[in-house]
Amino acid sequence: MRLCLVLIVSLVLPSLSFGQLGGTSVFNGLNIQPSARVAAMGGAINAVVDSDIQLAAINPSLIDSAMSGSVMLSYVDYFAKTNFGNAAYARHINSKWNAAASLLFIAHGAMDQYDALGNNIGSFNAGEYALSLGASYKVDSLWTVGLNQKTFYANIAEYNSVALAFDFAATYHKPSKGFTAAFLVRNVGAQLKTFTPGTREKLPFEFQIGITKKPKYAPIRFSLVAENLQQWDLSYVNPNEANAVDPLTGELINDRKFQFGDLLMRHIVMGAEFLLGENIQIRGAYNYRRRQELGLTDRPGMAGFSFGMGLRIKKFHLSYARAIYHLAGPANHFSLVFKV
């Protein structure tokens, strides 16, 4: 037990730091959206207690006894040659404990390789893989806590790295009020093996709070998630554009001051699920930060919005999501849940 505590502390301390956004951390595949339902809700929904294994990888404290025997298979045909998928399984242990496991892959495909002079010298492959083991413990009728342990492996050509990370979660659920709140600390850990000797990089540590509310007589559930609370200022300015001028305002980009409302909204993901009976859900969400970072200034389009639906047919639960990241196109997410 003492050895376990020492290991966890040694992994936590390097993670409790700020400024890990905008490409300054490694293994961002740890933040990939594990299911179509999560993707439809803006990439962040963590406070729904309805025994759906699609949410277990995001919040381990949502694993419950009704998930026992559930299997989830997810697939996304992402941008360029990248695609990723996820498989998960949940099991009831006893009156207090439940567990789940998942396996994630991200395949980037073959890429052209060039030398320092720009000559094509062949191709190389890149991929990422994560094994997650999670458990939940029911404290009382209102509170459940959970833990995910994730082992991550990535390779780029001849370079590879291994990382170990933990997610800690707690969920408060009051069914009579239709209210749920969740608290998550994600990706607490460190690299066990670095890509290059002596170059240790940070994992994408994150603190989230999420709430959902379902009005008693309305077939809708509202979701609000505050993400990346470990860092207030999530605005991003490209350091390579030190003298760039905004074509609309004429301001120097690096001199731009972000307003309080803009900084606040970069933490917020809001969405809703329309519950059309027990077998159909229509989902939609808006991710403000995604729109600000990926939408074009003069033609943002639908960047930041995501939509989807869930359909139960006998023993199968099908989910689909269309997440719009950029004017270049959306990503289509598919998930299938069934029991064995």
Question: Model-flagged regions — what are they?
Answer:
Residues 4-15:
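Bacterial N-terminal signal peptides
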Residues 18-340:
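Subset of outer-membrane beta-barrel
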Residues 1-4, 141:
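Positively charged n-region of N-terminal signal peptides that target proteins for export
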